[in-house]
Amino acid sequence: TDQIVALSSTQAPKLSAQQIAALSTTQVSKLGVDNLKVLSYDAIEALSVSQAKALSSTQVSALTSAQFKHLGTSAIAALASDRIVNLTNDQVAAITTDQVQALTTSQIGNLSGAQLEKLTTSAVAALSASQIKAIDSAAVANMTTDQVKAIKVEALGGMSSAQISQLVATTQIKALTTAQVNALDSAQLK
């Protein structure tokens, strides 16, 4: 552990995926943010579920958006909700469709409106009905027109009446396609 803490910013980028995979969770938790920022994409991909869980909010927030894109889906799903809350807008914008599908409903529910509006339309299109339902209704107001259009018809069925009300209040309801409108039921429109 002392060796990990003592790593210099010139040594950290040289850590291989195998070396990262061999680190204990305690060692991972001791990696400094300056060292995390310079880890290779292969090293980031090598982080296990338990190692990802060991990362602090500060460590997760320190990852560049390019590094974040290389976190495995299991590692993403393992991040505690408070880590999700502290994601930077650039990290959220970098979330891939595979990563967004791996997010738990609890993690999705912890995205702020500002974070939600940074999801790409591809990421929004990959959200399931249960993930859509988990979005905080106040955060729905931050969705862009393109994001609203990107919601799959089958996922739109997951929206609550409170979420639909936010779309109406922000005039985003106009962004819905005919197929999306036809998929809404009377309970959602109350």
Language model region names:
Residues 1-190:
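General marker for long, soluble alpha-helical cores
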